Amino acid sequence: MENTVEPVVIAMSSAFTPFPTGPQAAGPPPRKTVEYGTGIVVAEDGSIVTDRQLIDACVTIAIAGFGNADRIAEDRERDLALLRIYGARGLKPLNLAGGSGKTTIDLTGIADPQSQGGNAASTVKASVNGSDLVPAPAVGFSGAAAMDSDGKFAGLTQLKPVLVAGPTNATPSQAALVPADAVRDFLKANAVTASGTSTDAKASVVRVICVRK
């Protein structure tokens, strides 16, 4: 009996790779089952624009205080997503008229519930370096509205996790800015008339909740 078991044990032992290489090691870390971010209300019909990566692989997408949202369109090149909620009242679409490309901007979003209680929006400052935002805002600001010092729409915030070895969330995110004209072009291409008049970003952002399997 020992002679038949021993080769099997040896074969299994030699097949074990404690530190995998290649595609097995290079795969992205698993996404959170529930992830929170921010969306910008862009039209009174319930249209909301956000970061496409935030809602990637979601089984259900919900807008806090309003209910479930439909995924209407995506732009994988710019990582933008268009959502829509129905029957919502009291929406305040943001004025998306662009600013003059200031290097210091305000990011208005709704932080992850682990960082704050409630759905209140908050604003943090960041500097624009090319397409990068420094420093990166807190988790939950993916999809946040970026406004320049004149109160003009500067673009949409994206958070991209750094893929390195180590515990989940051990490293800070990288933040990027999708410029205002790219956001407007995306909406126009999807027949959304962005005629918002609100200049108060805090009144025009909503919490986006993504639920994955």
Identify the meaning behind each predicted range.
Residues 2-10, 101, 137-141, 148, ...:
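Soluble non-cytosolic domains of exported or imported proteins
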Residues 4-36, 87-93, 153-213:
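C-terminal cap/linker of serine protease catalytic domains
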Residues 27-51, 65-70, 92, 119, ...:
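A conserved glycine-rich beta-strand in the N-terminal activation segment of trypsin-fold
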Residues 33, 41-42, 74-76, 99-101, ...:
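Extracellular/periplasmic catalytic domains that process cell-envelope and extracellular macromolecules
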Residues 35-37, 44, 59, 65-67, ...:
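Envelope-exposed proteins and targeting segments
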Residues 39, 46, 50, 81-83, ...:
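Terminal peptide-recognition signature
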Residues 43-90, 159-162:
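Catalytic-histidine neighborhood of serine endopeptidases
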Residues 86-145, 156-171:
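Flexible, gly/ser-rich surface segments that form the specificity/activation loops bordering the active-site cleft
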